Amino acid sequence: MAEESPKNSAAEIPVTSNGEVGDAHEHGYNRDLKHSLPSGLGLSETQITSHGFDSTKEGVTEAGASQGSSAPPLPCVLSPSRVAASQLTQHAGGQRTHTKGGPVILADEIKNPAMEKLELVRKWSLNTYKCTRQIISEKLGRGSRTVDLELEAQIDILRDNKKKYENILKLAQTLSTQLFQMVHTQKQLGDAFADLSLKSLELHEEFGYNADTQKLLAKNGETLLGAINFFIASVNTLVNKTIEDTLMTVKQYENARIEYDAYRTDLEELNLGPRDANTLPKIEQSQHLFQIHKEKYDKMRSDVSVKLKFLEENKVKVLRNQLALFHSAVAAYFAGNQKQLEQTLKQFHVKLKTPGVDAPSWLEEQ
């Protein structure tokens, strides 16, 4: 059975009477070979011999091999050999593989952002570890910390004042709420007196002037309420925006101080150790990082000093005006001096909201 296989494959190749390969088979294979070759390369430009396929001479016929043939010499013709087909396939596949080598470089480029993020995470973790160690050392009394006595005293005073201002703000809001309820009650009481003055003829005058008194008190109460609300809004802006912004800068300054002390401690520990070829690069790198954080600390300390100075000036200016408004409005209200109360609001440019009237739109304000 094993010997029949070569005979069957050889029997499939048609041969003419003079021993040459049949023209029909030759033209069919040449057409297949043209399809398998790369574009732009003709069959006549390709010279293929039997030595190109591991010395396999199966299916290769040279022109003029048979004696007595008057036909002109034919070029080398390659029969449909499995070895030839496999090598052509490998050659074409190799070219396709070569052209697809580009995306590998792109894949390396895609990895670059991930590596950068990984490096940022590594630096952040190292910095967090150093700062946490510094904080724990300070709380345990083992580590040293840099202290600016004058600046630290100003920061402590600012935080203490902020708590006191918040307490004043809370009490003023309570007073405003209670005054609003009292004004609302006075209005209702004035309306009730006015109604009874119309229905009770014998007590018409008594109910009438009580109604007028309650309405006047309600009107003055609304004026005082406007002054108190203006005072609350101004103090709220000072406490929760201006002072809070300064405290945010103070927080950044404290973080910069912790980082500075952490890298300063590392540099001091390295300087106390031996100096050799292994430790010198570490000392230089630690010195570089220490210098960076020292400059950052100095910059934040300067920013905090400037902000504290401007905050103090702004705070004095705002509170001086608001405290004068609060005092004048309350004194005029309880003295029953309606004219002075109205002048106080005009002096501090306080506008009262008319009940039932919405605020003007931005087009009307133009």
Curated annotation (Swiss-Prot):
N-acetylalanine modification sites?
Answer: A2
- Basic and acidic residues bias locations: 22-35
> A GO CC term?
Golgi membrane
Alphabetical UniProt keywords:
Acetylation, Golgi apparatus, Membrane, Phosphoprotein
Q: Name one GO molecular function term.
A: protein domain specific binding
Segments of skewed composition (Polar residues): 44-53
Where in the cell is the protein located?
A: Golgi apparatus; Golgi apparatus, trans-Golgi network membrane
- Locate the region Disordered: 1-78
Which Pfam family is one of this chain's hits?
Answer: Arfaptin
In the record, biological process GO terms are: intracellular protein transport; negative regulation of retrograde transport, endosome to Golgi; regulation of Arp2/3 complex-mediated actin nucleation; regulation of protein secretion
CDD domains hit by this protein? BAR_Arfaptin
What InterPro entries does the database record attribute to this sequence? AH/BAR_dom_sf, AH_dom, Arfaptin_fam
Q: Where is the AH domain?
A: 146-346
**Where Phosphothreonine occurs, residue numbers?**
T354
Q: What is its main location?
A: Golgi
Record-listed Phosphoserine modification sites = S5, S36, S39, S69, S79, S125
Keyword Hydrolase attached? no
Per its UniProt record, what PANTHER family does this chain match? Answer: ARFAPTIN-1, ARFAPTIN-RELATED
What is the recorded function of this protein according to its Swiss-Prot or TrEMBL entry? Plays a role in controlling biogenesis of secretory granules at the trans-Golgi network. Mechanistically, binds ARF-GTP at the neck of a growing secretory granule precursor and forms a protective scaffold. Once the granule precursor has been completely loaded, active PRKD1 phosphorylates ARFIP1 and releases it from ARFs. In turn, ARFs induce fission. Through this mechanism, ensures proper secretory granule formation at the Golgi of pancreatic beta cells.
- Outline the subunit composition: Forms homodimers or heterodimers with ARFIP2. Interacts with non-myristoylated GTP-bound ARF3, but not to GDP-bound ARF3. Interacts with ARF1. Binds with lower affinity to ARF5 and with very little affinity to ARF6. Interacts with ARL1. Interacts with ATG9A.
Name the record gives this protein: Arfaptin-1
